[in-house]
């Protein structure tokens, strides 16, 4: 691995240097952040993992629809079941495939996501401290980590242990049965914005809501299963090509609003951590290129050679031809190895 000095020689600096010299306000968080907290989240595609144990029938349906989107397949199976019922056909096979799809997705989520007991409060409070310089957090992650971190940040403020501005995520309308409806991002000074949705967001009638019971430490996987049993699917965009993701975003009011918030940011500086800007996320790249952003400060993880790092720096610069792209050592922003500031 390269030393800090070797990285600095090719323009990959400690994050503190940028924090001291630039007006840092917002941050975009990708899957690299969650992987640092739980290596099981290394799978970008739940569908790829699901297919390792799926039946040939289910695999052929995904292939036939040319999709990796669970929701599209579930919708197709549900519609087929309805038509069959109207025509009084035996739908036993379809019901079996629906059951396999739902239970397989739940098993896949369970295999990749941490249990509540694995998410240590000390680590959440420590990371809340690391997020202190940032006003808005934008993320393409669909797990529960960042939501838990903003709750920890708010708790520290409310207990007068820190003077952080409060966070919200736009969901603050009580709509009953443990649900909070999305309103806007204007009520609180700091926001967590789910650019690709999250596994605890649902929009059965087009109006997106969040499962409030997450606040009570209930295993959110159990809650997801309850909604899947009613053929309601989480609002999350994690599968497919960039064009498919863009279409999914445009079809949901909350996701459109989230992307517009990223595009319409007032700040000219955006920090990026753990986000690769791969081809499947070109829609995010496009939003940033069409925003007021003038400087991107992107995390770079350790590699074995200067040549490897320089190749990555060049790839990222090409994606943003009109934006100054700067780089920082990913080891110098967040503390994952040991939590600091235990707060007694």
What residue ranges belong to the model's regions?
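Single-residue recognition of alpha-helix boundary sites
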Residues: 41, 152-154, 285
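Short, flexible loop segments at boundaries between secondary-structure elements
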Residues: 55-60, 170-187, 294-312
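Residues at the C-termini of beta-strands that transition into short coil/loop
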Residues: 50, 141, 196-199, 300, ...
């Amino acid at each position: 691995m390269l030393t800090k000095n070797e990285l600095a020689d090719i323009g990959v600096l400690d994050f503190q240097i940028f924090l001291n010299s630039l007006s840092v306000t917002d941050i975009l968080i990708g899957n690299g952040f969650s992987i640092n907290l739980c290596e099981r989240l290394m799978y970008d595609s739940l569908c790829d993992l699901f297919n390792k144990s799926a039946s040939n029938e289910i695999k052929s349906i995904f292939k036939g629809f040319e999709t990796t989107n669970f929701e599209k397949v579930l919708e197709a199976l549900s519609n087929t079941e309805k038509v069959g019922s109207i025509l009084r056909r035996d739908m036993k096979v379809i019901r079996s495939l629906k059951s396999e799809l739902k239970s397989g997705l739940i098993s896949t989520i369970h295999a990749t996501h941490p249990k509540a007991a694995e998410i240590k409060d000390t680590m959440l409070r420590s990371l809340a401290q690391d997020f202190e310089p940032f006003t808005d957090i934008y993320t393409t992650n669909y797990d529960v980590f960042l939501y838990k971190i903003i709750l920890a940040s708010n708790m520290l403020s409310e207990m007068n242990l820190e003077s952080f501005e409060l966070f919200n995520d736009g969901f603050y309308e009580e709509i009953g049965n443990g649900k909070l409806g999305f309103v806007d991002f204007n009520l609180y000074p700091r926001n967590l914005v789910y650019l690709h949705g999250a596994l605890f967001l649902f929009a059965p009638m087009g109006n997106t809501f969040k499962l409030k019971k997450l606040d009570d430490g209930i295993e959110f996987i159990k809650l997801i299963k309850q909604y899947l049993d009613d053929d309601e699917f989480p609002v999350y965009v994690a599968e497919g090509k960039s064009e498919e993701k863009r279409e999914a975003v445009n079809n949901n009011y909350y996701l459109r609003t989230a992307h517009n918030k990223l595009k319409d940011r007032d700040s000219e500086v955006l920090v990026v951590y753990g986000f690769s800007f791969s081809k499947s996320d070109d829609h995010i790249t496009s939003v940033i290129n069409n925003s007021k952003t003038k400087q991107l400060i992107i995390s770079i993880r350790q590699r074995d050679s200067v040549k490897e790092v320089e190749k990555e720096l060049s790839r990222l610069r090409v994606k943003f031809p009109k934006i100054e792209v700067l780089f920082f050592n990913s080891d110098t922003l967040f503390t994952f190895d040991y939590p600091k500031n235990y707060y007694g």
